């Protein structure tokens, strides 16, 4: 189902960005690896990976506090790219490693640059077709009058 939706959107020139939270109780190392593979397989254009972050006054914060799984109360660590709780199915160090793995694997090599180049070409082509494209003239004076 997701594959078909992604394909339909991409066929209409719409880029797909996935926002992925890593570290949920259902995830382990293998789950995260399969998730990254799936995103690449279905042709997601961009992905943003974050680590589950139990911010104050959130339900997940209350749950993790109740379970004694909060590892840090230093708010400078609450950046969505650092593990500040004890994951259920892996060590905090393994989750941190999987976070880096997700970014590096999704954006490895030149594939990302090629995808962004293709996306940019589609945008320009569409703007040219509908008359909204304006070429930037470097010789034209710009400024306030």
Residue ranges and their predicted role:
Residues 1-127:
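A structural motif corresponding to the C-terminal lobe/cap of the Radical SAM core domain
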Residues 123-145:
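Short, amphipathic C-terminal "tail helix"
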């Amino acid at each position: 189902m997701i594959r078909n939706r992604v394909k339909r959107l991409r066929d209409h020139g719409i880029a797909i960005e996935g926002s992925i939270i890593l570290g949920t109780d259902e995830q382990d190392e293998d789950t995260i690896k399969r998730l990254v593979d799936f995103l690449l397989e279905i042709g997601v254009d961009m992905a943003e990976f974050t680590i589950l972050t139990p911010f104050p006054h959130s339900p997940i914060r209350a749950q993790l506090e109740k379970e004694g799984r909060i590892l840090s109360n230093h708010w400078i660590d609450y950046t969505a790219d650092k593990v500040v709780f004890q994951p259920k199915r892996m060590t905090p160090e393994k989750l941190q490693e999987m976070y880096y793995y997700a970014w590096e694997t999704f954006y490895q090599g030149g594939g990302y640059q090629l995808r962004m180049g293709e996306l940019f070409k589609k945008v320009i082509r569409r703007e040219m077709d509908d008359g909204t494209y304006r070429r930037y003239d470097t010789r034209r004076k710009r400024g306030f009058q």
